[in-house]
């Protein structure tokens, strides 16, 4: 390894190790069931949400209890189920477009790591409309609050509902963009075994 690069890497590691306790990590607040999601959105006066998921989750009707709870509270739901494994820039842009066109006020990420990453990146693009995902690659390149983001994980293991990371793939070049920013940590999560 190039000695200058090695010194840079070691310095970066040292600085991050020292700074880590002072960085603004937060744990998502846990919501109590699907009714807790509806109550939160009602309290925040949000009348429509974007539900980001995938076709597999939708085909098993896993989103129905949440959809019914939101409908019962008078909250409209726009469903983006085009997320694929290793979400692409095109997925993110389609979700972002749906959010804006339908006048949504929050994003619910429902599913595994791919749905979470797609929702986080769509939120980042909504927060930074003039900044493409390719320029958000790396550490702390979003630096703006996202729309309200609620994570509903359906898998155990990815931990995307608590992380500051999202990985998006460029469908043409197959380059993966790791986006790491504290703004990507969802402020709320629903951990419901049902």
Q: PLM features: residue spans?
A:
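Short strand-loop junctions, especially beta-strand C-caps/beta-turns
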Residues: 54, 82-83, 194
